A protein has these predicted regions:
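Core SAM-dependent methyltransferase catalytic element
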Residues: 180, 186-202
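Conserved beta-strand signature within the Rossmann-like core of class I S-adenosyl-L-methionine
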Residues: 139-146
């Protein structure tokens, strides 16, 4: 396995190093994006591709009486996320091994679903977005957060199995999954957060 595969599926010692690095390097974009959601005291959140677990930890602080769950394809990531959030495991925090296209949670149980720096590596993006739509409650929010949105970025050739999506592409996938009120938010550094709502069917 090429070492860049650890971007999508951290394993072994190198994977542990990657997870520690991600917790640090993803902090600016994570804090910026989390401010875009109106957190309640009892918000139920799911972070897909939870990596090192720092965003779950932040969500638990933002919603002191809510829950924060995580899913990751990497067993190393699941272990790290559990370690970082061990204080609330089994009570307010639930972390499972799984993928975005087959989310191991029941339908309509989350107020917000986030995906930080991870959709580049999802095999079937449409199926994954359909799954996110399924687990969201009515009026729930999906937030896809990316630093990369230019298909010509050199990262596209440097990292194994990466696919970089434009805001327009992500918006279309979301629309096809049934999402509405799709908004593309960008900051001065070019970081992107594509937000969408699951509206109740009347």
């Amino acid at each position: 396995m090429g070492w860049t595969r650890n971007f999508s599926n951290p394993k072994g010692f190198i994977g542990k190093v990657f997870l520690a690095s991600m917790n640090a390097t993803h902090t600016p974009i994570s804090k910026w994006a989390l401010k875009k959601y109106d957190w309640k005291t009892d918000t139920a959140a799911l972070d897909i591709g939870c990596g090192g677990g720092m965003n779950i930890k932040r969500m638990l602080k933002l919603s002191p009486h809510g829950i924060a769950a995580g899913v990751d394809v990497s067993e190393e990531s699941v272990k790290k996320s559990m370690q970082v959030n061990r204080k609330h495991l089994g009570t307010r925090c639930f972390i499972k091994h799984g993928s975005a296209d087959n989310i191991p949670f029941e339908s309509e149980c989350f107020d917000v679903v986030t995906a930080f720096e991870t959709i580049y590596f999802w095999g079937d993006l449409q199926k994954s977005f359909n799954e996110i739509f399924r687990v969201l409650k009515n009026d729930g929010t999906f937030m896809a957060v990316c630093e990369l949105s230019d298909s010509k970025s050199p990262w596209g050739k440097m990292v194994e199995n990466i696919r970089i999506y434009t805001p327009e592409q992500l918006s279309q996938y979301m629309s096809d999954a049934g999402f509405t009120d799709i908004k593309v938010l960008k900051n001065k550094s070019g970081r992107m957060c594509v937000c969408a709502k699951k509206k109740a069917v009347i």
